[in-house]
């Protein structure tokens, strides 16, 4: 059976793209299968989305229309392809059939199917190229600021104006020159480096220099100027100096205050009492304690002893050890201490001097070996001591058979001796040996 005329004319004539007609079999000398005739494509199940293409590749109409290319495609994954080869007339123009569907994975050929009728022709559709960004591993995508205009509109940085900084430095130099004499040094404020304002447009006008704005932007506000207080302080120092001079002048011109001050000084100096020393004076076996100032002469000590011994002060002799003391000396000049003892001796009256009171009596103490044998006897100065001996023997119960001896300063006494002869005075002690 011969081939049809429409197939014979297209077996050896390639199309404009260099591809063969649908009836031509490019695989070899084998004869192409006889087409059964124009048969309609089966109705597809519905529009199915095209799977993601591997790349933009153009569809080939000749290969898509070839019947031998469409054979054996019934076992496709989508299940929408016909089981027999489709015949498409080369004289009819292709129309839109429906969504583009991949014939097989990895194949660049597509066709569209219409849902309205199964008689619609298969049409080649060029897929739309999708712009995709491919990032290699290890690369970081460039960040794009979405709200750049918002940030620039809200961000207000101080302008890069050197005039404002010059004005601030001049202001500080002027204030520093005014306060050179003051001792208080104002704290140094740290100035921030000038920053630039970031804007999209190049025609933005720079803001005028604003000193107050720079001050408010600092972390700690600078202290208020204290120039008036310092001026007042200098005036106050002048006033204090004048007051001091007036006080000095008043002190010079007011003698009353000076006299009062001197009197107060005298009172303070004389208020402390003079130191005193207790001087020990020994007369016979008796010890006298007399208070004497350190600057008083020993004459006062002699007068005190004369009053206690009922004798004249001229008859008092003071001895320190074996040395006779001058009555004009003082305890301070002699460096006397509490441990020193001064001996007192009563001198006999000079010859030819009559006693003023011959009947004067004195008290003499008589002491035996026992402590209980103690007796005080009143005798006259010119009276013999025999009466004293008799009173003592009678008081102690001693008879004439007992041998009794009386001694005064190691000297044995006799009955005819008198107190005046022996220099006896009141409170002198006579020892008794029985």
From Swiss-Prot:
Purpose of the protein: Regulates the magnitude of NFAT-driven transcription of a specific subset of cytokine genes.
Localization per Swiss-Prot or TrEMBL: Nucleus; Cytoplasm
Biased composition (Basic residues): 228-237
Lineage, top ranks: Eukaryota, Metazoa, Chordata, Craniata, Vertebrata
Name the record gives this protein: NFATC2-interacting protein
Domain Ubiquitin-like residues, every copy: 275-351
Organism listed in the record: Xenopus tropicalis
Record has Ribosomal protein as a keyword: no
First-listed, main subcellular location of the protein, grouped into a coarse class: nucleus
Cellular compartments per GO CC: cytoplasm; nucleus
Record keywords, A-Z: Coiled coil, Cytoplasm, Nucleus
CDD domains reported for this sequence: Ubl_SLD1_NFATC2ip, Ubl_SLD2_NFATC2ip
UniProt keyword annotation of Protease present: no
Span list, region Disordered: 1-63, 176-237
Compositional bias segments (type: Pro residues): 28-59
């Amino acid at each position: 059976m011969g081939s049809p005329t429409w197939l014979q004319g297209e077996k050896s004539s390639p199309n404009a793209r260099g591809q063969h007609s649908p009836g031509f079999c490019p695989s070899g000398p084998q004869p192409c299968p006889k087409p059964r005739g124009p048969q309609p494509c089966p109705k597809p199940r519905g529009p199915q989305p095209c799977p993601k293409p591997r790349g933009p590749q153009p569809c080939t109409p000749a290969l898509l229309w070839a019947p031998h290319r469409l054979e054996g495609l019934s076992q496709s994954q989508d299940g929408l392809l016909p089981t027999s080869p489709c015949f498409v007339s080369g004289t009819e123009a292709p129309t839109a059939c429906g969504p583009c569907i991949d014939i097989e994975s990895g194949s660049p050929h597509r066709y569209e199917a219409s849902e309205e009728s199964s008689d619609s022709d298969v049409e080649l559709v060029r897929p739309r190229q999708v712009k995709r960004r491919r990032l290699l591993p290890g690369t970081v995508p460039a960040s794009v600021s979405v709200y750049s205009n918002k940030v620039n509109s809200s961000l207000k940085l101080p302008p890069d104006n050197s005039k404002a900084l010059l004005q601030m430095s001049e202001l500080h130099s002027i204030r520093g020159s005014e306060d050179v004499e003051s001792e208080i040094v104002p704290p140094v404020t740290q100035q921030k480096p000038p920053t630039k304002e970031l804007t999209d447009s190049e025609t933005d006008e720079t803001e005028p220099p604003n000193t107050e704005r720079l001050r408010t932007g600092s972390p700690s506000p600078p202290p208020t100027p204290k120039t008036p207080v310092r001026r007042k302080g200098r005036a106050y120092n002048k006033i204090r100096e004048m007051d001091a001079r007036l006080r000095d002048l008043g002190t010079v011109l007011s003698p009353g205050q000076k006299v009062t001050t001197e009197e107060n000084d005298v009172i303070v100096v004389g208020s402390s009492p003079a130191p005193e020393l207790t001087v020990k004076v020994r007369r016979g076996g008796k010890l006298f304690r007399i208070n004497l100032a350190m600057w008083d002469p020993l004459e006062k000590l002699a007068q005190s002893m004369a009053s206690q011994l009922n004798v004249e002060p001229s008859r008092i002799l003071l001895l320190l050890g074996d040395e006779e003391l001058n009555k004009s000396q003082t305890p301070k000049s002699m460096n006397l201490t509490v441990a020193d003892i001064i001996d007192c001796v009563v001198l006999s009256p000079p010859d030819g001097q009559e006693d003023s009171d011959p009947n004067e009596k004195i008290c003499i103490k008589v002491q035996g070996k026992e402590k209980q044998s103690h007796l005080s006897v009143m005798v006259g100065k010119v009276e013999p001591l025999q009466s004293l001996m008799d009173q003592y023997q009678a008081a102690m119960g001693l008879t004439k058979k007992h041998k009794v001896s009386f001694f005064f300063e190691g000297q044995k006494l006799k009955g005819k001796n008198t107190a005046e002869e022996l220099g006896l005075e009141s409170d002198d002690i006579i020892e008794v040996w029985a």
